[in-house]
């Protein structure tokens, strides 16, 4: 895979420019997925992209997948370090479809719920809905996003080598490392994403650019 050195800001500008290009058959809203393990810092690129879009006069709404965790009773049903549950049961994908994607489908309302569950209090956040106007861009970021057939108009996977992932993951979360290895094998985010970013050193990312499909 050929990679080009680039800054996060320049990457965001390139992504924003791609989203500005006219496309056939698109709805009133565009959906972007920025996928990567927690150690990959997907929120950094999400914020940079939102800023780049706003500078172009576009509305942008950033949603973190971490705001859609399942209640603790479901996440820890089979123990606090169950890899299978982490892969398939930690994130409330049904709520993401219902509260994030359905409102931004053609004919949707644009009323997006920015988060649903607070894992610290283990209670609903009760956040108000955010209104994303037509022409706006929804940016969803977080781990394990590319294995659910989410309808992204543009997807980015931030990849870390196994060594970098282990170094940058808190030791208390090292039990999740096999989950990300399985995700890489089974869902193939490095090949399915529209753009692949290598960020072993977050100060010096490199990427493929936006790949033609």
Model-derived segments and their meaning:
Residues 1-18, 22, 158, 163, ...:
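NTP-dependent small-molecule kinase module
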Residues 27-32, 135:
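Pre-Walker A (Motif I) flank of P-loop NTPase domains
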Residues 31, 60-62, 153-157, 196:
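Conserved beta-strand scaffold positions in the cores of enzyme catalytic domains, especially
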Residues 33-51:
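Glycine-rich phosphate-binding P-loop
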Residues 51-61:
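Post-Walker A helix-loop "phosphate-sensing" segment adjacent to the P-loop in P-loop NTPases
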Residues 61-64, 70-122:
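Conserved nucleotide-sensing/catalytic segment adjacent to the nucleotide-binding pocket
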Residues 80-87, 150, 154-188:
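A glycine- and Lys/Arg-enriched "phosphate-lid" helix/loop adjacent to the NTP-binding pocket
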Residues 123-169:
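ATP-dependent NMP and nucleoside kinases share a basic, alpha-helical "lid"
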């Amino acid at each position: 895979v050929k990679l080009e050195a680039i800054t996060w800001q320049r990457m965001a500008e390139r992504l924003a420019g791609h989203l500005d290009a006219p496309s056939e058959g698109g709805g009133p809203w565009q959906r972007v997925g920025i996928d990567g393990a927690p150690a990959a810092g997907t929120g950094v690129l999400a914020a940079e992209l939102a800023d780049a879009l706003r500078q172009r006069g576009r509305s942008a709404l950033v949603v973190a997948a971490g705001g859609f965790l399942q209640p603790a009773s479901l996440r820890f049903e089979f123990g606090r370090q169950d890899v299978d549950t982490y892969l398939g049961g930690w994130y409330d994908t049904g709520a993401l479809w219902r509260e994030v994607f359905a409102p931004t489908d053609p004919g949707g309302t644009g009323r997006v719920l920015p988060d649903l569950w607070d894992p610290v209090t283990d209670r609903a956040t009760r956040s108000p809905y955010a209104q994303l106007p037509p022409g706006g861009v929804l940016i969803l970021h977080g781990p394990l996003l590319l294995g659910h057939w989410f309808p992204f108009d543009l997807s980015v996977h931030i990849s870390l080598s196994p060594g970098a992932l282990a170094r940058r993951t808190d030791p208390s979360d090292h039990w999740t490392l096999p989950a990300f290895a399985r995700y890489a094998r089974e869902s193939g985010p490095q090949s399915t994403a529209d753009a692949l970013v290598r960020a072993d050193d977050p100060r010096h990312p490199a990427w493929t650019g936006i790949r033609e499909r």
